[in-house]
């Protein structure tokens, strides 16, 4: 009997770059653009610096570049640093309740450089990496992973990135299955960083990226992994005691996850996005000033409440950048004052601003009964806003800018890239990097891109 891992491996090993539709290739390039943008913006964050210092100390062969720097190291260690950097500001994509780009794209870029892979094949690795991660996340319901304390980004992402790494190494279906089995031994990461804003939140995608390359290379060397790693008696499906075979296999090879990506407009937890867009739009349309806000109530799913509304004392008065990014009260308050919730709004020197904290105290997040059975990825919220002059507004917000049903345009993606990349590299290199990514499928190798974003 064919196992779930074997089904994925057979498909992934046989992906033909030339057979991918232009729309799929374009979607993958958008994912690369966003991941590189986030990595460059996050390159100087303290948690990235710490991971980089440890990686440098390993004394590994210099085969892959660290984004935004002149450093080179082994592909696994470069993926560790770059994955941490992509996720350093919580500004990276978030499809299927997983930050897939932070795990898959550092692997594709690192191995693409180290193995001198043609860019079209690297793009195909991105496509299949997103697919494998998404299908596993959907099959076991990533929302249940959150509720049980697991971090879906690293738990599921290591499999997609391992499939991408195996593909770039040219492994056959049987060996790719072993790579997935080995990746299952590395599938880990938990949500306890929510308790005190610990840096491990940023690290876990990078660790999954590192481990995925190791899994593929161990399989390449002949190490075996369980073929039933997903659906076996002790497999990954047991993490949530659920499986959705229909979602796991539906449209394999015709429906592509890179075309269903949730791109972030705000440098804040994705669970905050509908309310952020809704409140900012409402304030603009009704000409409401921050000082006129009497109270805001936001009803969300139970799992969303646990991430962005609790514990209330931390969400109202965040102590770290991560505390603030995971806080709906803080995110809404700073956005109402500044008109946006970008990187600067979550800087440490903003966290004690009495104007922000005063507004945050007027924002209440609760579990809405109508969302009790909402599935992962459903970030619908109910918004009630009362003003000091007696006005009351009620809205049901189902989507946000960057959602697949309201996607950011290429121009918006480009603007985000330029804002982020300019924090690390000069303007002419920003333009060169952008041009290289948008034309990635036409390049002979990765050198034009790497020249712009490293060194």
Over which residues does each language-model region extend?
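Hydrophobic alpha-helical hairpins/lids featuring a short glycine-rich hinge
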Residues: 83, 87-140
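Active-site nucleophile and cofactor-binding loops and adjacent substrate-binding regions
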Residues: 96-103, 121-126, 144-158, 203-205, ...
């Amino acid at each position: 009997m064919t196992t779930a891992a074997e089904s994925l491996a057979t498909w992934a090993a046989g992906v033909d770059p030339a057979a991918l539709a232009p729309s799929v290739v374009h979607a993958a390039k958008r994912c690369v653009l966003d991941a590189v943008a986030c990595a460059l913006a996050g390159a100087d964050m303290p948690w990235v610096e710490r991971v980089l210092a440890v990686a440098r100390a390993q004394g590994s062969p210099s085969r892959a570049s660290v984004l935004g720097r002149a450093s080179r190291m082994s592909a696994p260690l470069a993926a560790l640093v770059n994955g941490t950097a992509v996720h350093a500001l919580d500004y990276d994509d978030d499809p299927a309740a997983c930050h897939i780009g932070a795990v898959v794209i550092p692997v594709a870029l690192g191995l693409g450089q180290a193995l001198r892979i043609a860019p079209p094949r690297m793009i195909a690795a991105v496509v299949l990496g997103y697919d494998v991660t998404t299908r596993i996340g959907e099959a076991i319901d990533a929302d249940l992973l959150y509720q049980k304390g697991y971090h879906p980004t690293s738990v599921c992402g290591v499999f997609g990135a391992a499939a991408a790494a195996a593909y770039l190494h040219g492994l056959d279906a049987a060996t790719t299955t072993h790579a997935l089995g080995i990746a299952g031994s590395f599938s880990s990461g938990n949500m306890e960083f929510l308790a005190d804003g610990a840096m491990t939140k940023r690290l876990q995608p990078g660790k999954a990226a590192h481990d995925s390359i190791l899994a593929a290379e161990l399989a390449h060397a002949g190490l075996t992994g369980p073929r039933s790693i997903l659906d076996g008696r002790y497999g990954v499906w047991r993490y949530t005691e659920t499986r959705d075979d229909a979602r796991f296999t539906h449209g394999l090879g015709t429906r592509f996850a890179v075309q269903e990506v949730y791109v972030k407009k705000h440098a804040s937890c994705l669970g905050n996005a509908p309310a952020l867009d809704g409140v900012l739009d409402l304030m603009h349309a009704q000409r409401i000033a921050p000082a006129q806000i009497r109270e805001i109530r936001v009803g969300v799913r139970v799992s969303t409440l646990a991430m962005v509304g609790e514990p209330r004392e931390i969400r109202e008065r965040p102590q770290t950048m991560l505390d603030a990014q995971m806080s709906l009260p803080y995110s809404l308050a700073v956005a109402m004052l500044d008109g946006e919730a970008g990187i600067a709004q979550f800087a440490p020197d903003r966290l004690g601003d009495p104007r922000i904290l005063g507004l945050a105290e007027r924002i209440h997040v609760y579990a809405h009964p109508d969302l009790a059975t909402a599935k992962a990825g459903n970030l619908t919220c109910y918004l009630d806003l009362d003003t000091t002059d007696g006005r009351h507004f009620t809205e049901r917000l189902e989507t946000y800018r960057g959602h697949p049903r309201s996607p950011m345009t290429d121009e918006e993606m480009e603007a985000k890239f330029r804002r982020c990349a300019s924090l690390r590299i000069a303007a002419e290199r920003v333009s060169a990097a952008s041009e290289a990514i948008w034309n990635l499928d036409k390049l002979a190798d990765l050198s034009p891109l790497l020249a712009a974003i490293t060194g």
